[in-house]
A protein has these predicted regions:
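Catalytic-core regions of hydrolytic enzymes
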Residues: 61-74, 78-141
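Active-site-adjacent mobile loop/cap segments within catalytic or ligand-binding domains
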Residues: 195-205
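Soluble periplasmic/extracytoplasmic beta-strand elements of cell-envelope proteins
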Residues: 45-50, 125-130, 153-155
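Acidic/histidine-rich, surface-exposed loop or edge segments in extracytoplasmic proteins
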Residues: 50-61, 89-96, 156-157, 162-170
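A short, glycine/acidic-enriched catalytic loop
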Residues: 135-171
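Non-catalytic propeptide/linker segments at domain boundaries
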Residues: 1-47, 57
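Extracytoplasmic
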Residues: 41-43, 81, 121-124, 147-151
Length: 205
């Protein structure tokens, strides 16, 4: 984990539109970052939302699921199994007046997240849960305990463009914590559920 090249080879995909430094992807420092949080007395610790809530999955046995349903399942798991009170925002931000607008959705969702955090200062983890988009012939799945399971990917937006540098209006004071969170989650998934995760994807936005 101390090797930058090792991290890039085994853990990360850095999109060509952005860049990362060796100081930022310091694996030892990231895994040692203390991200522990105490469970509050009935206070929410996690917020799940969907910038692109209209995303759906390929039909299986005639049924089509949505990414919002995945969020509902995750909320149930966190609360019933782990006792982590979770807020799930089921708003569809990418449909405006009946028209699909994936870009404007980030502004709408961002405003709602800010309001939710102001109302619920106990929240420590915010998850923007998406469905990936790939060719229909590609099946990104593995087997967990003999059951076919979709692979997941952790995604970090680092507010930086390769050619223009840091994006000032998108300054993120939590960038280092987010990078630590995704790497620690990646390592835990690898420990308990090998092959569940794809490489962490890093992009400018």
């Amino acid at each position: 984990l101390a090797s930058y090249s090792f991290l890039l080879e085994h853990f990360y995909i850095v999109d060509e539109t952005t860049s990362m430094t060796k100081q930022e992807l310091n694996g030892i420092k990231l895994v040692k970052t203390d991200l522990s949080a105490k469970l509050g007395k009935g206070e929410p610790l996690v917020l799940i939302y969907h910038t692109h809530g209209s995303e759906t999955y390929k039909k299986v046995n005639g049924q089509e699921g949505s990414v919002i349903e995945v969020g509902t399942a995750l909320q149930k798991e966190l609360e019933t199994v782990y006792g982590i009170k979770t807020i799930h925002d089921t708003s569809v931000y990418d449909m405006v007046g009946g028209q699909l607008d994936r870009n404007a959705a980030y502004n709408f969702a961002g405003d709602s997240v800010k309001a939710a955090l102001k109302k619920n200062p106990s929240v420590k983890v915010v998850i923007d849960l998406h469905r990936d988009s790939v060719e229909s012939s590609i099946h990104l799945r593995t087997k967990i305990n003999g059951k076919s399971t979709a692979q997941i990917m952790f995604f970090n937006g680092v507010s930086r463009l390769a050619k223009k540098g840091d994006i000032g209006y998108l300054y993120n004071p939590n960038k280092e914590g987010n990078l630590a969170f995704s790497l620690q989650m990646q390592l835990l998934c690898g420990k308990y559920y090998p092959d569940l995760t794809r490489k962490i994807y890093i992009k400018g936005y």
